[in-house]
Amino acid sequence: MKALSVIHSTTSTDAEIPSTGSTKLVQQVCTTNPLHTTTSIDNHHADCTDGTAYNVPIQTSPPRKRYRQCGQSPSQHLQHSNPSIPSIPSASVDPGLCGVRTNSENCNKRRNHCGSQATPVIHLQGDPNCLKCLRFRLKRNCSHLFTQVSSTWHLTENDCTRDTKTGIITIHYYDEAQRNLFLNTVKIPSGIKSCIGYMSMLQFI
């Protein structure tokens, strides 16, 4: 086996080493930074056929951070970073299944947005005596234009006191067509306010 003498230094060092029939020039560079240590070897045998194993460190760099593009949603960024994750459609929920009004500018208050279990109603607010007289006339002359009418009721504050002196009655209808017929037939007195809406029908056991 050939004797090999290596001179270590913090700077470049050239050493001539005698050998049989040839002179080998070994250059070894050692730096103080272990992350960027490189070793260069000059030998007559470029394919390292002299039986000596050389370990040359390979410098690696950390993976680059992927930045999200401006205007890109988190789901799209996640889909772009990992193609194996399926994309989520923006309109995957049917608004008709949950009774949510999607158009904020829709002013059609006579349309049912609460599901099929709600019944169309009209709330009438005004003086309690006027509401009682109106309810009596409706039962006597227009009973075919609604299904039920409530007694006079009112709203209270959290301390169980009335917020106003006005009363409210609620009129129920079979469907929207019957309610529209009621509105086109019955004239609401000027001192009474009306509010169109829907209410869920409760079944008491």
Curated annotation (Swiss-Prot):
This is Protein E8^E2C. Its main location: host cell. One of its GO terms (molecular function) is DNA binding. It is found in: Host nucleus. SUPFAM superfamilies: Viral DNA-binding domain. It holds the Pfam family PPV_E2_C. Transmembrane segments: none annotated. Keywords: Host nucleus. Residues 1-20, 59-87 are annotated as: Disordered. The keyword Transmembrane does not apply. It comes from the Viruses. One of its GO terms (cellular component) is host cell nucleus. Plays a role in limiting the replication of viral DNA in keratinocytes. Recruits the host NCoR/SMRT complex to viral replication foci to mediate repression of both viral replication and transcription. GO terms for biological process: regulation of DNA replication. Signal peptide: none annotated. Belongs to the papillomaviridae E8^E2C protein family. Residues 7-20, 70-82 have a biased composition (Polar residues).
